Amino acid sequence: MLDINIVLAKVESSYGTDAAPAAATDALIVFDWTPQPVQYDTVQRRIDRGFAGARPTLNTRPRQQHGFSVELCGSGTAATPAKWGSVLLRGCLFGAPNIAADVTYPLASGGDDGASLSFYGQKGGTGDLMRMRAQGQRQNAVFNFEEGNFPYIVFDGIGVLNVVPDATAISAPTLPVYPDPVEVNSANTTFTLDSYALKLRSFTLDLGLRPTYRSLVNHREIIFDSDDGSDRRNINGQIVCELPGLAAKNYFSAIHGSTPIAMSLVHGTAAGNIVSMASSKLVLGAPTFSTEQRRYMMSVPYTLVPDAAGNELTLKTA
């Protein structure tokens, strides 16, 4: 019964130590969950034999992968963190939420790779269930806002595999209660780029993290790696909008000079269900252009470039 899916996650007190997430307190509401229960590197034994046939192999460096999405909304109370921020983003190089009249989710910029998660999941029910458990999970996250849809976050994580999947059922979960997500539209969403209210089609923000399995004798860990010489975190994304008349707003000077500009996105109007993100460090890349319903559209990539630790993005719920 593939329609039965249970997902639990909990922040670990120390890396790789099983936090034992419980169905009563640590369940998540997710969609499009696509686990890879086991992943390995494969080493072939290069032995000579007196007959033809496949060489024996050894599966090494065991890990587990989880891809899933969550709806992007508040917790229902302005001063209460949303679980996607207090739990899931902790595995994405974020610190613990700062709680005041609203909640701020700060970027972590220390010398290590930040907090980690114990992640449990169950696919199927009685007779065909599979329980998966990973420790030390870290992950990337991509925020998606598209006009006419609800906003959501896509997570892609890797955890250390200490025990293989089994047929032990997870208890019936107590799911968190939070407001329904609201449509991205003119009534619920405001977006400005360099203080100008663009006619926005979509906005994505990718944390640019690359979770990677690292294995040595006496040490296994999921780290944030990079294969292009950049930092562990490289926040980037895409803005798709109607190109404004250049007399009203001309972005080409900022693009030409790689000049940082400000961005603000506020989604939601009801207290407890407002999500906002802002940056003064947004650098636009080279745009591409298309037409939509006889209107000129611009798709422009961007990068958030900090000039101090963790100051490239402010993420809040209120």
Which residues are covered by each model-predicted region?
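Signature of extracytoplasmic/envelope-associated structural regions
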Residues: M1-A318
